[in-house]
Amino acid sequence: MPNFEQNQVIAVGLSGGVDSSVAALVLKEKGYEVIGLFMQNWETDSKDPFCTAEQDLSDAKAIADHIGIPLYVVNFSKAYWNHVFQHCLDEFAQGRTPNPDVWCNREIKFKSLLDHAKKLGATHLATGHYACIQNENNEYRLLKSNDSHKDQSYFLHLLNQYQLANSVFPIGGYQKSEVRAIAKKRGFINHAKKDSTGICFIGERKFKDFLNEFLLAQPGNIETPEGKIIGKHDGIMFYTVGQRKGLHIGGRPDAGEAPWYVVDKDVKRNVLIVVQGYEHPLLYSQELTCTNLHWIRDTEPSFPLTCKAKTRCRQADQTCVVTRLDNDHCHVQFEHPQRAITRGQSVVFYLGNECLGGGIIN
């Protein structure tokens, strides 16, 4: 984390979780004037048993009081609906699998929230992300966290130079275990609070039940690649490539005992295509194309580019060659076949520890 002048005001996005809480503590103990910001991105019934917003706000208030910083509650639900949620609905309707966290970081946390922090007099916005920022001759680089298991650079790959220049990741150099230990030592009520998982606006409720509230499901056939109908699906928007659960086609007398997996979606015919066996060759691909390209540095890399890539956040880095097709499309050729490459997800590129940027898988 860079050293700033001691009289600078830094706003911290306090989510009620342990990571942002320790991030605020680190800044406070370094002598900065710290203010907390709690985002409300989703309008929900206070009686909704699946929404943790009320508890999260309560935790954020308790932590702010504990550290001794003010906390402001800001509502970005309209911006979130317009710039994140509606985009996700459009993607689901087209049979793709979007990543809302990526869009939320670019459009809400490091845009709407950053702008609000500036209006309050803050010079920078800090969050509890596990990533690092390096200033190299006034060009900002996004680097992986020291904790490889918790690294979140994948979700931050759409950030631009302005956003990085005005952001701070105080715990990017910490291990998760260190963060929890600090929180416990300081008596934070959330030191053992579990990490949030799943899609943020769905919470712990069933994905299918939630989507049904916003999109009209169209049941259809489940077929093998050869066109044999072996079942019915509830709507292809509920499934993603590589998925095993929820197909309800096990125990067929004309097939072996190996489980079935989604391998593709035929949106035009409203057909879900499945194959049998985890290692089925159709689940693997050695190449992809991507669009909506974004490069973090002002100057994009030279092509063809030999680098590493991830097609999902927890995946190990995979060697590949990236070739520019046109202004907004790249071809990615992997050294080894990749399992369950999914349209709508992000492919993110790395050189060593640096996140270069990425695109959306076609």
Swiss-Prot record:
Q: Which keywords has UniProt assigned to this entry?
A: ATP-binding, Cytoplasm, Disulfide bond, Nucleotide-binding, RNA-binding, Transferase, tRNA processing, tRNA-binding
The residues forming the signal peptide are none
Can you tell me which residues form the catalytic site? 104 (nucleophile), 200 (cysteine persulfide intermediate)
Q: Does the keyword RNA-binding apply?
A: yes
Which residue intervals make up region (Interaction with tRNA)?
A: 150-152
Region annotation (Interaction with target base in tRNA) ranges: 99-101
The record's GO CC annotations read: cytoplasm
Q: Which Pfam families match?
A: tRNA_Me_trans, tRNA_Me_trans_C, tRNA_Me_trans_M
Q: Which reaction does it catalyse?
A: S-sulfanyl-L-cysteinyl-[protein] + uridine(34) in tRNA + AH2 + ATP = 2-thiouridine(34) in tRNA + L-cysteinyl-[protein] + A + AMP + diphosphate + H(+)
Q: Which GO terms are recorded in the biological process aspect for this UniProt protein?
A: tRNA wobble position uridine thiolation
Q: Its Enzyme Commission number? A: 2.8.1.13
Which cysteines pair up through disulfides? They are 104-200
Q: Which residues bind ATP?
A: 13-20, 39, 128
Identify the PANTHER family for this entry: MITOCHONDRIAL TRNA-SPECIFIC 2-THIOURIDYLASE 1 (PTHR11933:SF5), TRNA 5-METHYLAMINOMETHYL-2-THIOURIDYLATE -METHYLTRANSFERASE (PTHR11933)
This protein is called what? Answer: tRNA-specific 2-thiouridylase MnmA
Q: Which organism is it from?
A: Coxiella burnetii (strain Dugway 5J108-111)
